[in-house]
């Protein structure tokens, strides 16, 4: 009788565990959020010869590291993340042949956690060729063990046919690793070249109930002055602070040397806004922090013209964002006295633009980075402990910016 009782108890326990497992699996399958939201993104651009690897990407494997913001599936803690990757060939004039792509948790240098590696497919196939000027999304991957604020490695094996000039992002602030031939996740990655750029990767999205914040900016947002491979841009600190409170995607669409209206490096903000900002799925908030280069590059004596052009451009971008249902956070332009392009004309323009940002009421919220980072004793300069070149911030300054921006975003949910 005692043995029968023990048997029945064990059978009941097994059935209960089996039922719980079925419920969990069913939950992962049936209750997974249907909304795609960005956890990482970058602004793609044309690659000049000086930013291409010395070795051709043809018949190589390229391992690139990115830091995500949120993990997705936040309400389903026992479920892996469902994700997809966008690859871009938008700024190239020839197709790019890709033999395979896999994603894995990143370790130090080019090493990965091999057991976490998952191959991506494109319409059911591992190989894909992206036409000149085009983008492709991978099929959704439902089994990746993604953690919020973690570093993941995206490994791309190229075929023989690649463009002379790849579509890239120059200011990755992380090292990418190139190996000869096709290298799988279990194989040793024998690096033949290292570059601090990203090639062909554009967006990583997860299924999530959360939304994302898109940040439009120049080199200060792109992380010039941060530490390579340390993830200490101001948007990294922003993502960390926000995700301590609740899941949210933080998408850095900054480009070094970028202008709002015209000139500078890569497409100006007015031209790239629809793709880089409005093209982000379920990005409900915009941080607009650009204008330094428009002012710095304008000829002496033209401060009034650049002020008028910048304000007109801000109005256009804010109106577009509002029409798309986005809340707009507009940031003041930070000081740059001590940098080579400073003159009283440029400072007058900066002050006029910042006055309009603070008083116009056009944006929903003002992020007063100028007031935060300026030297109280010399308000047309950055605080000495916040900058090493009097234009860009350093990690200390970026941390202050990220924490401050997070406080405003959390107070205006």
Region annotations inferred by a language model:
Residues 20-216, 226-228:
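N-terminal secretory targeting modules
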Residues 1-30:
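Bacterial Sec-dependent N-terminal signal peptides
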Residues 144-145, 275-282, 319-320, 411-413:
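Surface-exposed acidic, glycine-flexible loop patches that form ligand/cofactor-binding
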Residues 314-322:
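Surface-exposed amphipathic alpha-helices with a cationic face
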Residues 40, 104-110, 180-204, 209-315, ...:
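Conserved SGNH/GDSL esterase-like catalytic core that processes O-acyl groups on lipids
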Residues 296, 333-413:
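Catalytic His-Asp segment of secreted/periplasmic serine-dependent ester chemistry enzymes
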């Amino acid at each position: 009788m005692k043995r029968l009782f023990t048997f029945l108890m064990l059978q009941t326990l097994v059935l209960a565990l089996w039922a719980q497992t079925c419920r969990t699996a069913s939950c992962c399958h049936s209750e997974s959020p249907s909304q795609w939201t960005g956890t990482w993104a970058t602004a793609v651009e044309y690659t000049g010869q000086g930013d291409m690897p010395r070795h051709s990407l043809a018949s190589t494997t390229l391992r690139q590291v990115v830091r995500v913001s949120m993990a997705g599936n936040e309400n389903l803690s026992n479920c892996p993340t469902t994700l997809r990757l966008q690859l871009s060939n938008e700024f190239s004039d020839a197709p790019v042949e890709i033999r395979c792509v896999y994603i894995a948790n990143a370790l130090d240098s080019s090493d990965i956690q091999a057991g976490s590696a998952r191959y991506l497919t494109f319409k059911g196939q591992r190989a894909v060729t992206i036409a000149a000027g085009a983008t492709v999304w991978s099929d959704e991957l439902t089994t990746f063990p993604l953690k919020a604020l973690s570093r993941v490695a995206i490994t791309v094996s190229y075929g023989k046919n690649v463009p002379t000039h790849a579509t890239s992002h120059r200011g990755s602030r992380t090292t990418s690793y190139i190996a000869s031939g096709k290298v799988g996740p279990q194989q040793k990655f024998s690096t033949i070249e290292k570059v601090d750029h990203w090639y062909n990767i554009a967006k990583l999205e997860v299924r999530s109930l959360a939304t994302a914040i898109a940040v439009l900016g120049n080199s200060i947002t792109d992380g010039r002055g941060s530490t390579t491979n340390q993830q200490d841009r101001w948007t990294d600190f922003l993502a960390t602070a926000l995700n301590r409170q609740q899941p949210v995607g933080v998408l850095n669409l900054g480009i070094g040397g970028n202008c709002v209206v015209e000139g500078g490096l890569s497409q100006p903000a007015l031209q790239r806004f629809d793709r880089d900002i409005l093209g982000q799925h379920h990005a409900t908030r915009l941080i607009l922090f650009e204008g330094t280069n428009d002012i710095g590059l304008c000829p002496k004596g033209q401060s009034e013209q650049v002020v008028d052009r910048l304000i007109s451009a801000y109005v256009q971008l804010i109106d577009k964002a509002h029409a798309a249902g986005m809340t707009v956070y507009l940031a003041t332009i930070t000081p740059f006295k001590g940098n080579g392009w400073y003159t009283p004309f440029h400072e007058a323009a900066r002050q006029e633009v910042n006055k309009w940002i603070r008083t116009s009421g056009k944006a929903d919220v003002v992020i007063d980075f100028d007031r935060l980072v300026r030297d109280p004793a010399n308000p047309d300069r950055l605080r000495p402990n916040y900058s090493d070149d009097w234009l860009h911030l350093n990690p200390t300054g970026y941390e202050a910016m990220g924490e401050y921006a997070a406080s405003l975003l959390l107070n205006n949910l």
